[in-house]
Amino acid sequence: MNTFGDNFRVTTWGESHGKALGAVIDGCPSNLPISEEDIQNELNRRRPGYSIFSTPRKEEDKLEILSGIFEGKTTGTPISGLVFNKGQKSKDYSKIKNTPRPGHADLNYFLKYGNYDYRGGGRSSGRTTIGNVIGGAVAKKLIEFTHNIKIIGYSTKIGKINGDFDYYKNPEFFESNSNIEKLFEKIENNPLRCPSKNSDEMKDYVLDAMDKQDSVGGIIEIIIKGIPQGVGNPVFNKLEGKLGSAFIGINAVKGFEIGRGFESSELYGSEMNDSYYMNKDSIKGKTNNTGGIIGGISTGSPVVLRVSIKPTPSISKIQESVNLISNENEKIEIGGRHDPIIVPRVIPVLESMAAITVADLMISSGYIDPCRI
Amino acid sequence: MNTFGDNFRVTTWGESHGKALGAVIDGCPSNLPISEEDIQNELNRRRPGYSIFSTPRKEEDKLEILSGIFEGKTTGTPISGLVFNKGQKSKDYSKIKNTPRPGHADLNYFLKYGNYDYRGGGRSSGRTTIGNVIGGAVAKKLIEFTHNIKIIGYSTKIGKINGDFDYYKNPEFFESNSNIEKLFEKIENNPLRCPSKNSDEMKDYVLDAMDKQDSVGGIIEIIIKGIPQGVGNPVFNKLEGKLGSAFIGINAVKGFEIGRGFESSELYGSEMNDSYYMNKDSIKGKTNNTGGIIGGISTGSPVVLRVSIKPTPSISKIQESVNLISNENEKIEIGGRHDPIIVPRVIPVLESMAAITVADLMISSGYIDPCRI
Amino acid sequence: MNTFGDNFRVTTWGESHGKALGAVIDGCPSNLPISEEDIQNELNRRRPGYSIFSTPRKEEDKLEILSGIFEGKTTGTPISGLVFNKGQKSKDYSKIKNTPRPGHADLNYFLKYGNYDYRGGGRSSGRTTIGNVIGGAVAKKLIEFTHNIKIIGYSTKIGKINGDFDYYKNPEFFESNSNIEKLFEKIENNPLRCPSKNSDEMKDYVLDAMDKQDSVGGIIEIIIKGIPQGVGNPVFNKLEGKLGSAFIGINAVKGFEIGRGFESSELYGSEMNDSYYMNKDSIKGKTNNTGGIIGGISTGSPVVLRVSIKPTPSISKIQESVNLISNENEKIEIGGRHDPIIVPRVIPVLESMAAITVADLMISSGYIDPCRI
Amino acid sequence: MNTFGDNFRVTTWGESHGKALGAVIDGCPSNLPISEEDIQNELNRRRPGYSIFSTPRKEEDKLEILSGIFEGKTTGTPISGLVFNKGQKSKDYSKIKNTPRPGHADLNYFLKYGNYDYRGGGRSSGRTTIGNVIGGAVAKKLIEFTHNIKIIGYSTKIGKINGDFDYYKNPEFFESNSNIEKLFEKIENNPLRCPSKNSDEMKDYVLDAMDKQDSVGGIIEIIIKGIPQGVGNPVFNKLEGKLGSAFIGINAVKGFEIGRGFESSELYGSEMNDSYYMNKDSIKGKTNNTGGIIGGISTGSPVVLRVSIKPTPSISKIQESVNLISNENEKIEIGGRHDPIIVPRVIPVLESMAAITVADLMISSGYIDPCRI
């Protein structure tokens, strides 16, 4: 189904070449101050055309809020927001209409539903994440307004180039809010949203792939700062399980890890366990190998998450596919321009999914009143 | 909450040192032939004491089915199964009663619920996965009986030692059912459930860690063989999202990947995309880099999943913690014997979660009738 | 929350005086032929101003479909439909802004959410049932297209005047589809949607109440014809429980009954039980006292439901209330014109809720494929 | 499915002649003091054999709690409770094995699931309400402990005999807690759980039906006292909708009403609307025609609900049915003794469902902390 969350629920709808795309947000308590601009800002961060590594289609993605906000505040009723599609010009699809693109969900959708929207992936297009970002913008506002929680994302690896900036190289850095604000500015001013010193090297790597008519993936790190202790549930409705499901639900994601993640498989127990100590009146972990979550529940340390993003499947190179009508092998050449890398544009989407997950579990864990704040 | 699944639902209950642990399975269609023995066999696979790397507590874990099966077949009503705890002798907990164990959820539970079951982790104990395995055994039977789907798991890495057997080194191997049966036998006869040639080296690695009073993690690969094309949903209720949530919900899991996973971040689009070709009358992928899932929906190729398991947090070494009464730093020494590695025992649990997820989505995708088979 | 249904889900949003109202329909299988006109027709049936007993505000309620339908058929993706509000002129609310209207949810909303939309009830307005009707129109089409199921509603009582036409007076009548078509025409041509011979008497009753600046209630009967045997579930997700929840969810409904309903409390078991007999090759009930449902599951006989509708709470008479600012008792006089009876306008809304419920349970019971038809 | 509730969830399982029946309660916050005896007392109220109007099968219905309670308090983990079946002697079912009983769900289950438990209805038996009562007992304790809410039920009509005691004849009576305690005692000492002066007349009416080998229905009123203002939600997850779904989910229930219910259809708006006035510092309704709920949300007045209970379908009279093997009409005579009326035994079940619903919505409305109290 197209709904994410149990107590703070986001239902998204819309196709890449339909009339509009949007989301209905249900379960946001009343009295949250929020404006259309707050949400528009987040939409602008994922909009195409914002850097050299993004398709130059200059979609405006202008938000309209149709319900749920009255006199500048949420009312407790569902918030409906949408973006009308503009400039989705009817181009010539005849070449690819019956030839599913490798790496895309075209064939899958066709076999499952008996139809697919050949005009650009329909519901499987990355464009549908507009709904995620609308929902995420409200969730971000809610958790920041009530608990001063910040969510920040950046790339730590592009293709084969490792960056030099990640949480575990800089744990103390993340203890200061002003550091985080400076970091955010740095990220937003970088075309790869990468705060590493060697980001120019990464840039060249992507430019080189563009020359080869190819595409590139990467790794994104998401930090959730300020989440109180106790958010999440044991067993099945875990904080990490919900975050994992949220992130893996983004089509390009092929891997997910928390804290030390895959590296933890190589450590001894005595290396991995975070020792406790008294820090003034509260109990803290000396390290944060666990990434801020144990047994489904937040520890109070920053939550550290990483995802692997596959290279964009749309490439200009000729690829091998089949023709669905003739049932014969057929080469396919996807015209137009494509994002050579979607890592930077996925970042606000992952931040949105993190925000929705945290808002949802903070309501169900009793940290945010479900009716009004 | 303690329920997993939407259409095939497993609700687990019970604590490590309570009277019993169990599961209620709701949504299994009627007419599935199943016996207590089928379920008991799976429970035996996760039972402690089955190898040198598992605690010698010889819990019997004897299953009782109390409802939902009549005259050897499911009836369509909820299946309630449980295991009474035996031999959970009341030992002396006074030393650790007020000192949360690092790496465990003790402190988290205490801060969240205002209580914790100091007798062995209560609900956060690995022992609660008995419920997962009861549910998984029914799900395995359902998907094997109706669609001949097989789920097989094994370790591919122990501590720092990489194995030489995994799906990508042997893709053709997995095309034969008799190969899979032989593989299963090999796995079950190995104390680390590792089919690699160098498993003795891994064994030594674990024995060495035991000598050091330490513990070891590893990586597990789970293959789902025979899943038809079209299982799963776009956007939020994706096959990969549900599997991710299911696996990450197991306490020791710190990372999850599908297909090429984290490696995909290093590939070019032209390397990662699986080309299509006509194989007799059906469309197949030349490779399976995507791991059998695109856009939330199964492609018909084997589903390939990998998880990272952290080292067991219970170790005999002295560790640093705090006393919850005195609010002072305190060393903790956890007595008794512990599993130096839980990787092999987690395998049947992950297989169970995979089976429940697949059963659930096959019902909601219309592959298995929700009422009767 | 604002979502109804589990497998066929309708999420409604919007307020009476907001920018727009609408619904997102999730879980409708692909390939259902449907047009905007199909949905518009149902919206027209609940639109104000269609008879002398309805407010003369001539809202156009023009539907727009923004997603989920491609080339005249559903695609399996969420269907988003909405109606922009027009002519909700900003009138002078100063008199009633702080004085909750008796019989309305104004006070309740204010105390719960700390705000209320004084411009006409906001989310508690009957106008929000536009979303229900959009969802219901799709559901009606789905169950009619796949199983030829018809849902028909009419009033059987207006105020104190009992009608002479209901299911139990005419059980054989409902066995013919052409009878049902004629009945539908008769209902739609009657301002009270009442097929009884004495409907003129009822009309006078309402006119008399209008003269007294008062309002009138009534009883509605809903028949679901053609529902196959086996729809619904035992215990908690029952056909009757879901229908009851759906109907009671409409604000004006204060009572709900199935089959003989409250009358069944007066019968002996030997009178109430429907005997079985062989009718050609199938087993039928001689009577249908149970109203087509036993134990949560449809019997194959027509489903017979009745609801009690309270008189419209908006009346022109002076009423007693309190001022929320001064905390003093205050009289309130609600200006403008109001529906003296909403019974006829509630009928398409109840039909919609019945259709959504039946569609939802037919999918979860395996009668309609969840992916494509 | 077999789960009721969203935030306070009760999953019931078990069949009338299986090994055991029980419930898993998920979402009860930690720190609620509760004993097995608290739950056993409620089970005793619904146990057969407690009066002359109940089958003399003296099932002990001895409760066992297997998880979720530690040192006399809930722990926040799932509470698993069950009752082992005893003395379900294997009697001779050969006469009725293939002949579905009129008024029961036998035929329905058989056609839906391809099997039915001929030994006494299996999952459709009233005996499965043991699970409801286990869940309800915990919910009652939770809402009484945290908010002093009382739920009380009694019969107001037996067969054709109207009682003289109901809420609307005695609204002031219900304002005193000591009155309610006295009322409860009177109810529990009456074999029909009827506090009316003419209950002896009702008793004779049932005895007369027993002589005729027939059965009798009735009407039950349930009062929820002390529920705070604001519980419930607009639109679909309404307090009245949830209560309706909960009550209609009990097999014998054929009608449900709130407040004036069906009578409200006969009233004018000016009669039905409850006027507001200032009562010291709070706003109260002068009357409670609405039954304590408007627009999905509690008003703070007592919640008044009524249900119609059909006569017990099991009667000793010869009835007409069909043989499922021979497909011929066949008479059926159901041997053994049966409850001539189940109205009094249904009362604790309805109270349980009311308690679960209120607990669930108080958690989701922010009145009860979801984690710990």
UniProtKB/Swiss-Prot annotation, chains A, B, C, D:
In terms of domain of life, where is this protein from? Answer: Archaea
Q: What is the name of this protein?
A: Chorismate synthase
GO CC entries? cytosol
Keyword set includes Amino-acid biosynthesis: yes
Q: Which InterPro entries match?
A: Chorismate_synth, Chorismate_synth_AroC_sf, Chorismate_synthase_CS
Q: What's the Enzyme Commission number for this chain?
A: 4.2.3.5
Pfam families per the UniProt record, alphabetical: Chorismate_synt
For this UniProt entry, the molecular function terms from Gene Ontology, in alphabetical order, are:
chorismate synthase activity; FMN binding
Essential cofactor(s): FMNH2
Can you tell me which residues bind FMN? 123-125, 251-252, 295, 310-314, 337
